[in-house]
Amino acid sequence: MRHAGTQDIETPRLLLRRLLPEDAPQMYANWASDPEVTRYLRWEPHKSPAETRELLAAWALLYPNPDYYQWAMVEKATGQVFGSISLYNSLPGEPQQKTEWPGLDLTDGVWEPGYCIGRKWWNKGFTTEALRAVVAYWFT
């Protein structure tokens, strides 16, 4: 894998692009403030759009890094930012962990997807569509 960072990806129904601080109102309304949606995330539900904007501003600083992958999921038909999808390194180089799986090249760690979408978009195939596109991007 040649790390290229978060680049725009299009699918028939989605635009996957970088999250921006201006996305805070939609992110807050569509998923970041919902305890059911954020239940298994690494952060608690947001209490205000300002909290969401602060998180997005911090994430924006990471986009110049070529191994940072965090996309907004935008529904093309409506322009709504309704979720996010990312790739993250869950084993970023601990030498002792790399030897636990003999025969596997774990030089670059272990990369895993993460995703979160607003309830209104559940069970409509959006996450599957986004994940397929991200996996295709990852392996090209």
Positions of predicted regions on the chain:
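GNAT-family acyltransferases
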Residues: M1-K120, Y137
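Conserved acetyl-CoA-binding loop-helix of GNAT-fold acetyltransferases
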Residues: Y115-C116, W122-T140
